[in-house]
UniProtKB/Swiss-Prot annotation:
It is a multi-pass membrane protein. This is Taste receptor type 2 member 13. The gene is TAS2R13. Belongs to the G-protein coupled receptor T2R family. GO terms for molecular function: bitter taste receptor activity; G protein-coupled receptor activity; taste receptor activity. Keywords: G-protein coupled receptor, Glycoprotein, Membrane, Receptor, Sensory transduction, Taste, Transducer, Transmembrane, Transmembrane helix.
Amino acid sequence: MESALPSIFTLVIIAEFIIGNLSNGFIVLINCIDWVSKRELSSVDKLLIILAISRIGLIWEILVSWFLALHYLAIFVSGTGLRIMIFSWIVSNHFNLWLATIFSIFYLLKIASFSSPAFLYLKWRVNKVILMILLGTLVFLFLNLIQINMHIKDWLDRYERNTTWNFSMSDFETFSVSVKFTMTMFSLTPFTVAFISFLLLIFSLQKHLQKMQLNYKGHRDPRTKVHTNALKIVISFLLFYASFFLCVLISWISELYQNTVIYMLCETIGVFSPSSHSFLLILGNAKLRQAFLLVAAKVWAKR
């Protein structure tokens, strides 16, 4: 049974890979068609395109690293191939996490209502704020790459000095833990910002509901619905973050106990998260949901 597990997990990852490419490709295609036809696109749709493209890159990177780890381990743990795989994973993962955070900030500034002058200043310039944050995250990416590159150089120096396979594999596990720890530390910042945005949205909704009660207008007003929908989207991003940290935790456990099954489970979760969350984004966006239902209806009619 255990010998069949790699094949089973491979089939699951390939299925998730196909679903992830279809869902994220659908987001890019529909928004690009809308962009060409209307010659303009909202900030949300532009962010969705960037997020979908980065997720496609992440899914491809996970699939390639999966097959390299299973069939070409010597390439995976040494040389230029190692640097390319780790750097591509860092870049795609960076944009995945930070774009999720930027979405949370965008909904906070667009929907929440606070009387603070600083908040109102940011609210009136939301598009510039989002652009500046997106550019500012490149500093974190640059620092992350520098730190990881130091780990890689240190590992390659030790690898070239001692090519004994047992030594290389045990030392590679230490190197892998160092890389994952560094990435986790850099991932805490976007998660913290997204969580604060979520709390502020809840606080804004609570204030709005209290105001509605005082005015005897009830709770079922359009602004309450907008708040609720925004909270659902932000919660979905927080769940995406949770799955990411769960994946990292499981990966650490696999390194600690040298358990291949746990590693394969980690990779499976790593592909499932960006694939499934994109479907939630499609269903939560009116334009994408309508296009998806139209395509689904046409496909069903042809059967």
